[in-house]
Swiss-Prot record:
Stored Pfam families: Flagellin_IN, FliD_C, FliD_N
Family, similarity comment: Belongs to the FliD family.
Claim: Coiled coil is one of the keywords in the record: yes
Name the record gives this protein: Flagellar hook-associated protein 2
GO cellular component entries: bacterial-type flagellum filament cap; bacterial-type flagellum hook; extracellular region
UniProt keyword annotations, A-Z: Bacterial flagellum, Coiled coil, Secreted
An individual GO BP term: bacterial-type flagellum-dependent cell motility
Coiled coil: 403-436
InterPro entries noted in UniProt: Flagellin_hook_IN_motif, FliD, FliD_C, FliD_N
Subunit composition and interactions: Homopentamer.
UniProt KW DNA repair keyword: no
Task performed by this protein: Required for the morphogenesis and for the elongation of the flagellar filament by facilitating polymerization of the flagellin monomers at the tip of growing filament. Forms a capping structure, which prevents flagellin subunits (transported through the central channel of the flagellum) from leaking out without polymerization at the distal end.
Amino acid sequence: MAITSAGAGSGIDLESVISASVSAKKAQLQQPIITKQNSTQITLSGIGQLKSSISAFTDILDKLSAPGAFNKRAINITQSKDDPILKVEGKSGASNGQYNIIVNKLAETSRQEGIFDSSTTPLATQDGQLTFKAGDKTFKVDVKAGDTLQDIRKSINSNGDNFGLSVNIVNTADGKAKLVIDSGISGDGKDLTITGDNAELGVFEAGGGVMSQTRAASSAEINVDGNVLKSDTNTFDDSIQDLKVTVLRVSDKDSAGDLKANKVDITTDKTSIQELVQQFVDGYNTLQDKMNSLGKRNTFVGGVKQDDGGALAGDSTTRAIESFMSNLLVSPSQNSGTYSTVFEIGIKMDNKGKLSLDKTKFGEAVDKNFDQVVALFGGEKGLASTLNSGLKEYTKSGGMLAQREDVLNSDLRALTQKTATANAQLTKYEAALRAQYGSLDALLVKMNSSASALATLQTSYQKS
């Protein structure tokens, strides 16, 4: 049934009456739902912000609780920064120490070269195969009848089994083609060998009339405090325990023509460790600030709530997390036999629960009891790991905060259904009002019509 303007017949503004009644009913039905939806969405947003802030802090704790996180080493090498001779990197477990290192020679790959009349003239009249070997690496390349030097070069370089060998062609001044093959494999005794499975491909073999070896493969060699060490590559990995030494060039010579040693000092990297602990302090404070903001209670002015609190105002979750964190900080360490808590090594807490780092006191603790500082923070039962695992109970899939989100999302779905039900009730209510006022309008029209007829009769009677 079409809805028309109520009161059109009687001239009375019944439409305004219906509109006012519907608005009042709408407020009665929908406002509680809207208020609850807004409140639920704000809480859901607050839970999301809290999860994100906790995750940011646990990322820092992941670094602190990782094996070797505090085993940072500062490495100083007496050499030119612009033209370094070697690079030294410390691994987890590296110890402090001092070494005198001389780089005697660098590792080299083997190379073969040969001059061909042309790079575009077919070399093969029949199918065949070339085999390349260097050390324990080998691969094969198919050569087709009619292949040129350029074709063979492309097939070698693009071969999926290629172990790093490279082939290049240099066009010489006399119009010929110089083939240069570099094995890509270094180390004593790992010279490149090339063999062909037919006479035509024999030209690629060293001593086959065209190709010859122009450089032998060799190992890198260094002298560490009088001990000669060799490596197939220019990297000496764990030749010195827990150190990775990469040689870049041969050492410089002194006035007598002898190679000079480069002094390598490895010490505890206090700056790096201090920066790591500062990240812990900053991350802790950032999370505290976020929880304080989210959990801020609403204020009251003249007994009226101002709705100026945080998204989790009055929520017990933030208080529980704050309590867990602060209690863990003051709990005696199970790892360190020297320090009971982090407050003994330079970390301080103010009356608002915020942390700060006394760098001087922390530096002294690292100097005197480095292992105990590491024990306090690191290890399975250290502060970082314990705090990390506890906080992740809140943020993990199926954890406390995820469960809260599930409940809140379920509440929102229920409220959406309530909104649909309220809208249906509102539609029925408006239809009932229009039917009711429509009947009234029709009755008023009849009454007006009857009154008009009586008035006409009365006028006629008076005139007669």
